[in-house]
Amino acid sequence: MKFRLLILAALLMIAAILHSIFGTAVAGEGEKVSYDAPIISGVNQDGATVNFADIYKKGPTVVFFYPKAGTPGCTKQACSLRDAFADLSKEGVQVIGVSFDKQEDQKKFKADQKLPFDLIADPEGKVVAAFKVDKMLKGLLSLASRQCFLIKGGKVVWHDAKASTAEQAADIKRVLAELK
């Protein structure tokens, strides 16, 4: 009996993990906040150093985190922002994606999905740690939890700790409108 319960618990945990990586999250509400945005740099898909402070100076900045490049949920999240990129750009919004993936994986993901924004390769988790993004599967794999931040004037003004996938851009547009 105890063995069956252990098996059931293990299966439920595996299902939850797989859903968080591959599944579709519902639209996140997020919360308005106000604290200094992390000043850090990372390496993009092309190997160039991206200084986040320089990006923040260009205008409102969306920094979104995702577990794994090329997986269904992460693709929906990134493509939501890709499809709204022209509208976001008109508002002066910069977009940066971050995951633990290696540079070559980020480069492939960007090319495959025709993403018009940088993807930060963060295999050591320095950017993830700077933003205090939770890690999934600690000790087993390095996967960032799906989260999104909106930065204005060097301050994080909105944080969605359970960021949506297909509705990511709609959430950001809504928050931008509320902040005007």
PLM ranges: what are they?
Residues 23-53:
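N-terminal "domain-start" segment that seeds a small globular fold
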Residues 1-11:
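Bacterial N-terminal signal peptides that target proteins for export
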Residues 75-115:
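Structural microenvironment flanking redox-active thiols in thiol-disulfide oxidoreductases
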Residues 52-75, 81:
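Short active-site neighborhood of thiol/selenol oxidoreductases, capturing the structured segment around
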Residues 9-23:
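Bacterial N-terminal signal peptides
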Residues 143-180:
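Thiol-/selenol-based redox modules, centered on thioredoxin-like
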Residues 96, 113-145:
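Short, internal strand/loop/helix patches
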